[in-house]
């Protein structure tokens, strides 16, 4: 009866319904996949990039279905190629596609896939042709990328390495492996280096270099400096410096840097760029020092002293935000949930 009273749903309507599954408070990937199957299989409606973006985003926002997002992306690229191996223009990935895939990568801490996506976006930006939707790296892309670094867990932990005493090693008989040292490949050989960071130090080194490149490209854009021989010059020229982007960069330091280094970055990051710290800046910092692992009383005292400094600035912002909440909702990013998180983090620190 419903289908008699109303016209048949078209591709755009299905895309809107699927996108709604991602925008709800709790993503509904199962319902989105059911709608996508109904559209493509039952109704024989050909999907477009917009439809794929909707279903990929819905799956990406659920950790359980994050890998399904990558499967759908492969289907989008491979199952509709023509005889020459080219994907039709209506199914070529755009910025929304890559952002959705990065959201899936950060959900599961999949840094190799995130790095591949960024490299692919860089390549697509260089090979952009007239009539195609442009692909470029902006601040939303880099926010997801930094969050992926924050959620990535390196395989190597120095404190987990077990050492063998020299005398014990000499007593052991390793048989055919005794001569292995003669054919050992030096660790400095670049061909044997891992493709992703293997320790927290390598993560911070890589992220710091990436952040420096963003600032360099932004500076060249502002000064209109085009004198550069690299084809990848200004690849980060579309990245706007926002508090959200800086918060994502700080999240990497909170997870992988020592507390003292993270606070030094926090204290010196915003003012030189003439950006204000928003509510999430303070909440993320307080939660980082409340949840961080501390192995000594000195580290606990340091975390508490840093948190007190952050708390003073937060209270000033909170007072302004709460006073304006009735007339300007979400003023300065302050809402009831953010206030709750800030107070919970500080109380947790004080009770340690």
Question: What is the role of each PLM region?
Answer:
Residues 1-352:
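A basic, Ser/Thr-enriched alpha-helical scaffold prevalent
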């Amino acid at each position: 009866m419903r289908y008699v009273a109303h016209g048949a749903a078209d591709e755009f309507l299905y895309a809107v319904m699927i996108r709604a599954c991602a925008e709800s408070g709790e993503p509904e990937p199962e319902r989105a996949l059911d709608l996508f199957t109904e559209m493509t299989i039952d109704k024989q409606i050909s999907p477009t990039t917009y439809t794929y973006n909707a279903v990929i985003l819905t799956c990406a926002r659920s950790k359980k279905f994050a890998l399904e997002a990558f499967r759908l992306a492969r289907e989008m690229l491979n199952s509709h190629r023509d005889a020459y191996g080219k994907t039709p223009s209506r199914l070529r990935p755009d910025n929304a596609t890559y952002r959705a895939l990065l959201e899936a990568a950060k959900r599961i801490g999949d840094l190799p896939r995130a790095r591949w996506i960024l490299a692919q976006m860089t390549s697509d930006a260089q090979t952009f042709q007239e009539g195609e939707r442009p692909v470029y790296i902006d601040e939303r892309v880099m926010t997801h990328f930094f969050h992926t670094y924050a959620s990535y867990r390196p395989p190597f932990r120095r404190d987990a390495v077990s050492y063998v005493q020299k005398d014990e090693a000499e007593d052991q008989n390793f048989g055919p492996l005794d001569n292995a040292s003669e054919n050992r490949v030096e660790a400095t050989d670049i061909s044997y280096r891992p493709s992703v960071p293997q320790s927290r130090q390598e993560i911070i080194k890589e992220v710091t270099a990436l952040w420096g490149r963003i600032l360099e490209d932004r500076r060249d854009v502002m000064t209109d400096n085009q004198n550069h021989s690299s084809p990848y010059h200004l690849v980060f020229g579309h990245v706007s410096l926002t508090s959200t982007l800086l918060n994502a960069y700080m999240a990497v330091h909170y997870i992988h840097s020592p507390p003292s280094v993270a606070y030094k970055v926090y204290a010196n990051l915003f003012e030189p760029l003439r950006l204000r710290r928003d509510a999430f800046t303070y909440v993320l910092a307080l939660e980082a020092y409340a949840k961080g692992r501390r192995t000594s009383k000195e580290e606990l005292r340091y975390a508490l002293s840093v948190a007190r400094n952050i708390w003073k600035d937060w209270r000033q912002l909170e007072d302004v935000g709460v006073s304006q909440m009735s007339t300007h909702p979400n003023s300065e990013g302050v809402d009831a949930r953010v206030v709750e998180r800030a107070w919970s983090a500080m109380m947790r620190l004080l009770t340690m």
